Amino acid sequence: MQPSKVNKHRIIFHIDMNCFYASVEMAHNPSLKGKPLAIAGNPEERKGIIVTSSYEARGKGVKTTMPIWQAKKLCPDLILMRPNFDRYRAASREIFKMLAEITPYVQPVSIDEGYMDITDTIYAKDPLVTANQLQQRILSGLDIPCSIGIAPNKFLAKMASDMKKPLGITVLRKREVEKLLWPMSVEEMYGIGEKTAQKLNSIEIKTIGDLAKKNVYELKQLLGVNGERLQNRANGIDNRLVDPEAVHDFKSIGSSQTLPHDSTDVTELMQLIHELVDNVERRVKRKEAAGKTVQITIRYHDRKTITRSKKLYNYIDNHREILFVAKELFEQHWNEAPVRLLGVSLQDMETKRNIGEQLDLFTYEAIEKKEKLKVTVDKLTKKYGSNIITSQKNKNESQENQQPRTSFQKDFLDDYKKP
């Protein structure tokens, strides 16, 4: 399917589920409603961080990424629950099915938010009625609240959906940008993170209005092409299309995990890298693809984040090769400070069908032999379990039966993609 068309009169919705994980848990167990609830990585040990929380908890000062001990100090009666990703995934599928019944132009951007373009549908006659009906259908069918932004482009729709929560419906017209958006601080603008905001502040840009009116040359000097792009958004200009196929495109496959506590334990960190590589390999195989660049992400206890990558001569797709490069990068660039999050990704992706056309005979024969062995191993693993075959290196290590920890948002998008 082609993306939605470009014209000046499009009707774009941005649908954002309110406190999604917490809302799903409350729908599953209504006795939790009206109580301060937080989803956290490791509530038993009180060393994890808050993944998300209900509005009741937020009212007491509980915030995402806050350590559990700090959240409990602010809100002693806080109810803590581990995440149930299967439950969240199932709820998300049902929500996006409802959106797809209105228009084929639906673009998910994460498990709990997405865009839809209703311009060329019968629902375009009264967008507010359509938004209200959709909101009520999700609430009555799944007991999950959402906010909806309605605007002529994706950026304004996203900004609109953030204006009223929970259960808000907001229309934001381009002519209202100066009145409604320009007084807001740049930190509140979608697409601007903490570091970008600091850079903008350094050249006296404090509000969205300041950004909209700044000399574009200065912005490009500071932020490159992104400077002009952000200025366009600040002026309400965004020509991106709602593209249902965008979820099918991929240039990288990655997995990341926040640790239950800040760690300097090399054994623990290496074990996590193993698990992340396991997950990357599984998803790479599912796509029948390979990549030429391995990247690691390290986020420290103070939230400072670094990414380091290594470009390879040949495409790789298996655990051993990805792990070798990931460990090498980690050992070279970790400064031994406590680590809060690790990530591994394989980038510069290409399908094996396309890669095959680039291989010479000798390379192909070597890969073919390796592939035959790996197919046999995969079949045995599938039939008898992951413990049937272990490498000589790992034969004395304990094998874990649990699913590797994953970057859940990317897994969700994989689910949404058509086979």
From Swiss-Prot:
S-S pairs: none
Every UmuC domain range: 12-193
Active site residues per record: 113
Region (Disordered): 388-419
Matches recorded under InterPro entries: DNA/RNA_pol_sf, DNA_pol_Y-fam_lit_finger_sf, DNA_pol_Y-fam_little_finger, DNA_polymerase-Y, DNApol_IV, PolY_HhH_motif, Rev_trsase/Diguanyl_cyclase, UmuC
GO cellular component: cytosol
Cofactor note text: Binds 2 magnesium ions per subunit.
Keywords: Cytoplasm, DNA damage, DNA repair, DNA replication, DNA-binding, DNA-directed DNA polymerase, Magnesium, Metal-binding, Mutator protein, Nucleotidyltransferase, Transferase
Any Pfam family the entry gives: IMS_HHH
Catalytic function, reaction form: DNA(n) + a 2'-deoxyribonucleoside 5'-triphosphate = DNA(n+1) + diphosphate
Site feature: Substrate discrimination: 21
Cofactor: Mg(2+)
Enzyme class: transferase
Top-level taxonomic group: Bacteria
EC numbers on record: 2.7.7.7
Main location: cytoplasm
Function according to Swiss-Prot or TrEMBL: Poorly processive, error-prone DNA polymerase involved in untargeted mutagenesis. Copies undamaged DNA at stalled replication forks, which arise in vivo from mismatched or misaligned primer ends. These misaligned primers can be extended by PolIV. Exhibits no 3'-5' exonuclease (proofreading) activity. May be involved in translesional synthesis, in conjunction with the beta clamp from PolIII.
Protein name (Swiss-Prot/TrEMBL): DNA polymerase IV
Organism for this UniProt entry: Oceanobacillus iheyensis (strain DSM 14371 / CIP 107618 / JCM 11309 / KCTC 3954 / HTE831)
